[in-house]
Amino acid sequence: MEQEWLNVGKIVNTHGVRGEVRVVSKTDFPEERYKKGSVLYIFKQGQGEPLKVTVASHRQHKQFDLLTFEEISSLNEAELLKESILKVEKEHLGSLDEGEFYFHQIIGCEVYDEENQLVGQIKEILTPGANDVWVVGRKGKKDALIPYIPSVVKKIDISSKTIHIEVMEGLIDE
C-alpha cells in the first residue's frame, strides 16, 4: 500500500545563520506537530524521495513558525529547503477528542439538510476566525458557506462521509 501524506507547512525562507527555517504552517496543532523530536518529511519539487528530518527546536515569530532540524546545521543547507513542503505520514496523526476532526476527514463529505436532501459536498474549509466555515459545492448552483457551529451542524459521520445540518433561513441561496 502506498504511503499517504498530509501537508503541515511550507518552508518559505531561512532565518538567521544557524539553519533555522521560516514555515507557513498548515496545521491546527503546531505545538504538537513541531515539538522537539517530531519526525517530518521535506518534499522538494523535482526531488524523488522526501528528506526525513527531526525537529530540534520550534518557536513562533510573527505569523511564522521557526524550526531547526537535527539534520540541518547551516544557512547553506537551509537555503536549499526554500519552497519545500513539510509533511507527516497520515498513519502518525495524533488522536483527537470526541467531536474533533482533521480537515481531510471533513473534506469530501456529503452534506444533507433536515429533510435528508443532498445539499452538496464539502470541498474546502475556511478558517476566518471564531469558527470554521465549510465550503459546500453544489451542482449547478453557487457554493454554500456553512458555519461549523452546533446550531447548524447536527451530525457528523466520518465512516459514511455524511454530515447533517439544519438550514437556517438565509443560509443557503437557491
UniProtKB/Swiss-Prot annotation:
Which GO molecular-function terms appear in the entry? ribosome binding
Superkingdom of the organism of origin: Bacteria
Q: Where in the cell is it found?
A: Cytoplasm
Q: Which GO terms describe its cellular component?
A: cytoplasm; ribosome
Q: Which Gene3D superfamilies match?
A: PRC-barrel domain, RimM
Main location group: cytoplasm
Q: Which keywords belong to this entry? A: Chaperone, Cytoplasm, Ribosome biogenesis, rRNA processing
The record describes its quaternary structure and partners as: Binds ribosomal protein uS19.
- Classification via PANTHER family: RIBOSOME MATURATION FACTOR RIMM
Q: What is known of its domains?
A: The PRC barrel domain binds ribosomal protein uS19.
What's this protein's function? An accessory protein needed during the final step in the assembly of 30S ribosomal subunit, possibly for assembly of the head region. Essential for efficient processing of 16S rRNA. May be needed both before and after RbfA during the maturation of 16S rRNA. It has affinity for free ribosomal 30S subunits but not for 70S ribosomes.
Q: What is this protein called?
A: Ribosome maturation factor RimM
| Species for this entry | Bacillus pumilus (strain SAFR-032)
Chain's gene name: rimM
